[in-house]
Amino acid sequence: MSSETVSYFSHPFPRRQSVGVSVGGVIVGGSAPVVVQSMTNTDTADVDSTVAQVAALHRAGSEIVRITVDRDESAAAVPKIRERLERLGHDVPLVGDFHYIGHKLLADHPACAEALSKYRINPGNVGFKDKKDKQFADIVEMAIRYDKPVRIGVNWGSLDQELLTALMDRNQAEGAPLSAQDVMREAIVQSALISANLAEEIGLGRDKIILSAKVSQVQDLIAVYTMLAQRSNHALHLGLTEAGMGTKGIVASSAAMGILLQQGIGDTIRISLTPEPGGDRTREVQVAQELLQTMGFRQFVPIVAACPGCGRTTSTVFQELAQTIQEDIRRNMPLWREKYPGVEALSVAVMGCIVNGPGESKHADIGISLPGTGETPSAPVFVDGKKVTTLRGPGIAEDFQKMVADYIENRFGLGRKIAS
């Protein structure tokens, strides 16, 4: 995994120092960059569909992918999925998402236990009453046996009710009781920390434990992760559960995680979006990357800056060109990462009129200022801050696309290395 450090602007808060955890060779926490991960929504027993979706998520940039392991058929499929992915060249860590019977599935399917890179345990449903600690311990012991890390993932929708009830009763006995919301937040944090302490007592190292505490409200998420960060040095997995569809899910997740990341809290993130019918699952990976890149913490793809448009830009040419360039970059990035090291740092500007167009284009590595309404039908192009040509005629878009491709080849390609 890349260990780049990016600083578009100074970070007002130091990064929280957590214990690094290796997940199939991808380091989460410590001094490693914040990791992007995602989860499939296929039936894991359907090997073909799951392999296809994991491969798509990995190509999109997901550095870790979680899959559901909910029954014998799913567990039996995991080694086949792992083998098929490796044959296709996708060496991506797979995380097994276990609920209720994870201890049994891992025991009954040792090949599954070996093929997974991490186990996810939910303290709220790993077992109930007198079976809870035993079944939790069984999974932890499996992790120790197979040298795998675990994520202890608390979720407010399946919170340990015994713990919550005990805290509620204790709170009522206080002279100045806390609100029910505050007690719930405390229960979530305690569930994670108590489970982590138990895992360590069983023998799992702190460098094998990642914590998460997922809720569906932005302020709750900020509160519980701030508490976790203050009370432990475990690596933290950020995620807003049930964030929702479309812009609502994107805004809610970005608002919550952006605040935490800005405070130095968070070692890996997943943007949980409810896909629209027929929607692309890789969208959540793209949003996670854009969040980290926009905040200046990582670089994944070249930035395409474009003006929002106004009454001076009634033509849609600049919008269409910006979209085409962005889609072309996304489509080619898997190849470009290998062929053009450092291409992630490229910036492209596609502007729509003379007001800010030339200035913005000069600030990009390569930029074009297209004519606005009533302006001369010509488009100056700037490379590394200098005007190099003016494009005219109906082929402006195609000509600029070729210039972008040539710039990438000349700056990041093999020819540059030979010349240097």
From Swiss-Prot:
Cofactor(s) the protein needs: [4Fe-4S] cluster
UniProt-listed GO biological process terms: isopentenyl diphosphate biosynthetic process, methylerythritol 4-phosphate pathway; terpenoid biosynthetic process
EC number: 1.17.7.3
Keywords, ordered alphabetically: 4Fe-4S, Iron, Iron-sulfur, Isoprene biosynthesis, Metal-binding, Oxidoreductase
Cofactor detail note: Binds 1 [4Fe-4S] cluster.
Recorded catalytic activity of this chain's protein: (2E)-4-hydroxy-3-methylbut-2-enyl diphosphate + oxidized [flavodoxin] + H2O + 2 H(+) = 2-C-methyl-D-erythritol 2,4-cyclic diphosphate + reduced [flavodoxin]
Enzyme class, first EC level, given as a word: oxidoreductase
Residue positions binding [4Fe-4S] cluster: C307, C310, C353, E360
Keyword Iron attached: yes
GO MF annotation list: 4 iron, 4 sulfur cluster binding; 4-hydroxy-3-methylbut-2-en-1-yl diphosphate synthase activity (ferredoxin); 4-hydroxy-3-methylbut-2-enyl-diphosphate synthase activity (flavodoxin); iron ion binding
SUPFAM superfamilies recorded: Nitrite and sulphite reductase 4Fe-4S domain-like (SSF56014)
Pathway: Isoprenoid biosynthesis; isopentenyl diphosphate biosynthesis via DXP pathway; isopentenyl diphosphate from 1-deoxy-D-xylulose 5-phosphate: step 5/6
Superkingdom as given in the UniProt entry: Bacteria
InterPro entries according to UniProt: Dihydropteroate_synth-like_sf, IspG_bac, IspG_bac-typ, NO2/SO3_Rdtase_4Fe4S_sf
Chain segments annotated as transmembrane: none
Family listed: Belongs to the IspG family.
Described purpose of this protein according to its UniProt entry: Converts 2C-methyl-D-erythritol 2,4-cyclodiphosphate (ME-2,4cPP) into 1-hydroxy-2-methyl-2-(E)-butenyl 4-diphosphate.
Protein name, per record: 4-hydroxy-3-methylbut-2-en-1-yl diphosphate synthase (flavodoxin)
